[in-house]
Amino acid sequence: MRILVLNWQDVTNPQAGGAELHLQEIFSRIVALGHSVDLLCSSWANVPRRVNLDGIDVHRVGTRHTYPFLAQRYYRRHLAGNDYDVVIEDLNKVPLYTPLWGVRKLVALVHHLFGATAFREASPPVAAAVWLSERPLAALYRNVPFQAVSVSTANDLVARGIRRSFIRVIYNGVDSSRLTPDSAERSPHPVFAYLGRLKRYKRVDVVIRAFAGLNLGDATLEIAGTGDYRAPLEGLVRSLDVAPKVRFLGFIPEDDKIHLLRRAWASVLASPKEGWGISNLEAAACGTPVIAANSPGIRESVIDGETGFLVPPDDPQAMTAAMRGLVQSPELVGVLGAAARKFAETFTWERAANETLAHLNEVVAS
């Protein structure tokens, strides 16, 4: 099968996140199964326009801001003649409206849609543009098969007018052979960790406020990730007088991420909406409980009271209480962590890739 994937970024882009990791893990495995995969994405400064990433032939065009305007033209000039069996729009950020491209077989892969949450991240004009860009989905994509990474995302699509019978839910995976527990690395004092981008809509401020409410002398909060909201978060840390206890690590390599997760008593996530929450599953694979907002997508990657705790969104006090529960009963860290590891082992990238390939074969045969 010859496959073209459209996504704003590839996994090596400095702005890459969970969607790009998902793309790489799934489609590199599909390549390994003997299929051909091209990726059309945006470029950035001082990188080649063509590159091969684990068998995926990557075409880069434009920038993060110009990609949606240039992608269709590049496709028509350079890729349309390749006679792809199926084209996949990894539909995130602003839709590319691929049903208007004249593609024969199309699948829309969705992690999550922004909806009103766009107004928590961007200026009102930009947020309004994102919100409006999602409005035509039901009309333009009404005959397009969808692949969603969670039931929450599928429900969101249905609420927007997509027929449920057109949606296939295929959960993300995690590399449990690389992400493994090591109790010897667990910190003797409470460490809470956030791993992810520092964007306003991620609500890392809730995590910081929750940690500040813990008011425990030997506890620390370690924040790993980059983003344009770091400075305001650092200001919040200073204003709450917890600067000595909060470390901003910036970008950390994969091995350091694993050591951080093993060291932590819990990984903490306060996003009001995610497609799934890959970082939760990575923590679970390392035998680390998760404290997370009971938000769409996220709630499917944590079993409340078994692999961690779900708390009401935008509620620092509830998150503080969950943190305090682990501090007061340290044995819970090991109990929840062991259950989290077993939970993570049920999600593999091999399963996700095979289910995706089966879905694509069904679409091509239809």
Q: Over which residues does each language-model region extend?
A:
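Short hydrophobic beta-strand element within catalytic cores of glycosyltransferases
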Residues: 289-292, 302
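A short, well-ordered alpha-helix in the C-terminal region of glycosyltransferases
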Residues: 318, 325, 332-346, 358
